[in-house]
């Protein structure tokens, strides 16, 4: 640069622009066994048994069962049983 104000013609680029790959070469499969075990442990600790009791669609007899799932799954089951999903007892199936 010559003078007090820079001029575009005086700028000299030292390097030319090159295309740069932004692709990440890491893979989730490369997790160590410890990381996978930690993830599985966290998942297992989130799952717990839930007792569910619902009336039979036909005879209104109570149907009870226990399922093991995480809190999100039991909320989904609750929404389904409250809306469109109905269960039928073994006697009414025949």
UniProtKB/Swiss-Prot annotation:
Which superkingdom, per the lineage? Viruses
Motif mapping: LXCXE motif: 22-26
GO terms, molecular function:
DNA binding; DNA-binding transcription factor activity; protein domain specific binding; zinc ion binding
Q: Where in the cell is it found?
A: Host cytoplasm; Host nucleus
One Pfam family for this entry, by name? E7
Choose one Gene Ontology CC annotation of this protein and give it: host cell nucleus
Zn-finger region bounds: unnamed: 56-92
Cited InterPro entries: Papilloma_E7 (IPR000148)
Q: Does the keyword Chaperone apply?
A: no
Q: How is it modified after translation?
A: Highly phosphorylated.
Q: Which UniProt keywords apply?
A: Activator, DNA-binding, Early protein, G1/S host cell cycle checkpoint dysregulation by virus, Host cytoplasm, Host nucleus, Host-virus interaction, Inhibition of host innate immune response by virus, Inhibition of host interferon signaling pathway by virus, Interferon antiviral system evasion, Metal-binding, Modulation of host cell cycle by virus, Oncogene, Transcription, Transcription regulation, Viral immunoevasion, Zinc, Zinc-finger
Task: Output the GO biological process annotations, alphabetical, semicolon-separated.
Answer: DNA-templated transcription; symbiont-mediated perturbation of host cell cycle G1/S transition checkpoint; symbiont-mediated suppression of host innate immune response; symbiont-mediated suppression of host type I interferon-mediated signaling pathway
Motif, Nuclear export signal: chain positions: 74-82
Segments for region (E7 terminal domain): 1-42
Subunit structure as annotated in this protein's UniProt entry: Homodimer. Homooligomer. Interacts with host RB1; this interaction induces dissociation of RB1-E2F1 complex thereby disrupting RB1 activity. Interacts with host EP300; this interaction represses EP300 transcriptional activity. Interacts with protein E2; this interaction inhibits E7 oncogenic activity. Interacts with host TMEM173/STING; this interaction impairs the ability of TMEM173/STING to sense cytosolic DNA and promote the production of type I interferon (IFN-alpha and IFN-beta).
Annotated function: Plays a role in viral genome replication by driving entry of quiescent cells into the cell cycle. Stimulation of progression from G1 to S phase allows the virus to efficiently use the cellular DNA replicating machinery to achieve viral genome replication. E7 protein has both transforming and trans-activating activities. Induces the disassembly of the E2F1 transcription factor from RB1, with subsequent transcriptional activation of E2F1-regulated S-phase genes. Interferes with host histone deacetylation mediated by HDAC1 and HDAC2, leading to transcription activation.
| Domain remark in the UniProt entry | The E7 terminal domain is an intrinsically disordered domain, whose flexibility and conformational transitions confer target adaptability to the oncoprotein. It allows adaptation to a variety of protein targets and exposes the PEST degradation sequence that regulates its turnover in the cell.
Which family would the database say this protein is a member of?
Belongs to the papillomaviridae E7 protein family.
Query: Would you tell me the protein name for this molecule?
Result: Protein E7
């Amino acid at each position: 640069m010559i003078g007090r104000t820079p001029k575009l013609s005086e700028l000299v680029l030292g390097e030319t622009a090159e295309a740069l790959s932004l692709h990440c070469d890491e893979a989730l499969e490369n997790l160590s066994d410890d990381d996978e075990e930690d993830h599985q442990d966290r998942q297992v600790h989130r799952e717990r048994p839930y007792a569910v009791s619902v009336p039979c669609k036909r005879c209104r007899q109570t149907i009870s069962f226990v399922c093991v799932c995480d809190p999100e799954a039991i909320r989904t089951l609750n929404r389904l049983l409250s809306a469109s999903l109905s269960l039928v007892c073994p006697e009414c199936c025949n």
